[in-house]
Amino acid sequence: MPAVTNGRQTAALDDDVVVFLIGMRINRIRSLRSWLPAFRAMPRMLGELARDPELGFIHGQSFLSGRVILQVQYWRSFELLSAYARGHDHEHLPAWREFNRLVRDSGTVGIFHETYRVGPGTAESLYANMPAFGLGAAVGAVAVAGRGQSAGHRMNPGVADVPAVEPY
């Protein structure tokens, strides 16, 4: 289990990164043969990304909510993410083609992704008494005191740093 860092921290977001949400929703649980290949493809892709940092993948975390499986990923750039997704010598493109062949029009499983480019002044975060998590786990975390006690100040250093409650 990851170690908890006591106190308040924020992501050390000094450069742009890409936040990529990718996942699937199982629409028909009993149609195992339809959605299982899509489900099994993700661990292969994550293994490949972990073995080769040059592909641009920084960090990822998985979440389960009912029928939805979500992977939140952090990438060095959109260009590297796109190159991986379309690369003929990587795991993703064959999995994408197999998904389309098996279930694209069946409705048994849905897939989704959202892509965001974030950087200094466009995102802020707070982690209080937490292990490394999210953006802070991807880019590193620093004490809030060095970046501002309030979310408004962390988003825009020109805004007065007046926290709504007493910081700890």
List each model region and its residues.
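An amphipathic, aromatic/His-enriched active-site/gating alpha helix that lines ligand/cofactor pockets
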Residues: 78-110
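Short S/T/G/P-rich N-terminal loop/turn motif that feeds into the first structured element of a domain
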Residues: 1-68, 80-83, 106-168
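Tryptophan-centric aromatic hotspots in well-structured domains and transmembrane helices
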Residues: 74-76
